[in-house]
A protein has these predicted regions:
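Structured mid-to-C-terminal alpha-helical surface segments
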Residues: 2-63, 72-81, 85-299
């Protein structure tokens, strides 16, 4: 099937992307169309190959997608890019040995896409993680092209009320894969809790941008009560309930902080999809989300 994106449609169960040149051409075209970095798109494609293997594996009901890859799927690659895959595991241990066995099983799921996965390293996440977790580094090989992948896997996340079935639209194919994912309210609640509790020490500008873009595109679908409950559940899990009533003061402090303003300017310059967004516009979206959260108290 030639012409546009349908060129890559799975035909008779076999993948039509057979060579590195084909894949690079498709990535290059998508890069131009979406004004997105081709290297990042290549990583996204390989992360999709891993996601599809999850969806066909015995662990498909234990893996729950979250983080940047989920946000990018919700808003579009032209509005958010990501380099890594984040997931939480339920009903399974999260230690190095168990995750190594789990990953090894997933990457051997037979799919005729020509992609081979190699586990490079696996270790406990020691940085400022909200939940205990494991970091997996892999490389993928497709027709001689090697692409690095990083996957962060956590456990014990507070998902309110529960994970949802998500139809993940593939980047280069006219089809979707069904996976478990965070619901929108939990995605936003985690980011809001991080902004409130870390105040001006939160240098992750993507948290601020994600709230803005998700609120813009999906704000009308949010359930205030679920959002409120998700924020409380996240704060309880992270031991930060006492900070929630300081939210308004924190927003003022963050908005007026010169370092935060400079960090936002740097983020705007780095990512074209954020280039037109002023800092006060971002902070207004965060305040609106918190007001919606407070509405949920009385529901």
């Amino acid at each position: 099937v030639q012409g546009g994106k349908n060129f890559t449609t799975v035909f008779g169960g076999a993948f039509m992307i057979k060579t590195a040149r084909q894949l690079k051409d498709l990535i290059r075209n998508l890069s131009r169309e979406k004004s997105a970095d081709a290297q990042i798109l290549m990583r996204n494609y390989m992360m999709e190959r891993f996601l599809e293997r999850i969806s066909l594996s015995e662990y498909r009901d234990k893996f729950i997608l979250k983080g940047g890859m989920l946000v990018a799927a919700m808003v579009g690659l032209d509005a958010r890019s990501t380099m890594d895959l984040d997931a939480t595991i339920k009903g399974a241990n999260v230690n190095v040995e168990d995750i190594e066995n789990l990953i090894s099983s997933i990457v051997t799921v037979p799919i005729d896409d020509g992609v081979k996965f190699q586990l490079k390293s696996i270790s406990e996440i020691m940085d400022e993680a909200e939940y205990p977790g494991i970091r997996v580094s892999m490389s993928t090989t497709f027709d001689g092209v090697v692409t690095p992948l990083k996957i962060d896997i956590s456990t014990g996340d507070a998902i309110t009320p529960r994970e949802v079935r998500y139809s993940f639209k593939l980047m280069l194919e006219d089809r979707s894969i069904d996976i478990w994912a965070y619901n929108l309210e939990t995605v936003l609640a985690e980011k809001l809790e991080t902004i409130i509790t870390r105040t001006t020490t939160n240098t992750r500008m993507r948290d601020f941008y994600d709230i803005y873009i998700l609120e813009q595109l999906h704000g009308t679908t949010l359930n205030p009560k679920i959002l409120h409950d998700a924020l409380l559940a996240t704060a309880h899990k992270r031991g930060s309930e006492k900070y929630l009533n300081q939210a308004e003061e924190v927003f003022d402090e963050v908005e007026n902080d010169s370092v935060m303003q400079k960090l936002w300017e740097a983020y705007r310059k780095k990512f074209s999809y954020a280039s037109d967004l002023e800092w006060d516009v971002i902070m207004k979206a965060i305040r609106r989300l918190y007001v919606l959260c407070e509405k949920g108290i009385s529901l």
